[in-house]
Amino acid sequence: MANPQPETPTTPTTPTPPAGQITDQPAQQLQPGQQQIQVNVDYLKTTRVHICMPCYGGMLTESTFMSYIKWSNTCRQLGIDWTMETMTNESLISRARNTLTAKFLHNKESTHLMFVDADIGWEPWHLLVMLNAQKDVIGGLYPMKSLPVKWCVNGFDGAEVSEDGTLQEVSKTGTGFMLIKRDVFEKLNAHPATKPFMNDIGLPVELNPHMKTYFDTAVRENRYYSEDWTFCENWRDLGGKVWVDKRVLLRHTGTYVFDFQTQDQLYKDLHNLAVQNGQALGNIVTSAAPVAQPPVEATVLASSKKKKK
């Protein structure tokens, strides 16, 4: 994905609302590093997101927990309805995603399935702008659990980009933070890779019609694809598009081995990356990202204007 040039920040002359505050008035000027996010609150009120979180061992990170607290408060303020489903102690992630999908499909009132993994940290506006985009499949961007940062996404030449440059079509992206419309699964039923499977893990029998392999591993072009890569490819096989919002840069929490060998390897990797990009080592943190750096803060502007088609 293209790396856009950073904008020159403006010097504020008036106070700016704190991060995450919902306002019906546009800010006159923003602090350096701030960004104003506009969403159509009337449209958002017609949606009902069903958040699904696989959490092996019944655990989630502090960053993820705090994200849900802020999300709940924001939805209460905006009047947005949402539901949530978790799944614990399922070590097979593909079966966990398929089971959560079956529960979502059984919940007829929900319009969107939102996968949020238990190690992803996010802000309320991240999900709001993804909903506001009204795309069939759209994700946020999060790094793999490695340093230097490598993003869990695959782009391609000639990809479509939204008029304002915030959305970009990709070939594959991770399901760790992915929003999917309900009718996507109805269309995926026509894909030969979507097969029913037996409910043999003690789930309610009413879920049986929805127990299908929407998320499964596969070998394509001699490559072993994970369940999220396969989902994206199957959807694109049917003519669907996968999008990411380049503003939605997330936190991915993991463990790290603190020793001199790891540090030495990190320095070597950063040096090689700096050489490839023609940058000084001290500047490589910003140049390594394939997308614009995230806003430090965001003010959500709740608008009632109709979304342009």
Regions found by a protein language model. Name each.
Residues I93-R97, D228:
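Conserved donor sugar-nucleotide recognition element shared by glycan-biosynthetic enzymes
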Residues A2-S91:
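N-proximal low-complexity "stem/linker" segments adjacent to membrane-targeting elements
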Residues T99, D183, T230:
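Active-site phosphate/pyrophosphate-handling residues
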Residues T99-H112:
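Active-site nucleotide-sugar/metal-binding loop of Leloir-type enzymes
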Residues N3-P6, L44-T46, T194-K309:
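C-terminal catalytic/acceptor-binding lobe
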Residues D81, D119, D136, K241, ...:
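Residue-level detector of anion-binding/catalytic polar loops
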Residues E109-G121:
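Short beta-strand-to-loop acidic/aromatic patch adjacent to the donor-nucleotide binding site
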Residues E123-D216:
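Conserved catalytic core of nucleotide-sugar-dependent glycosyltransferases
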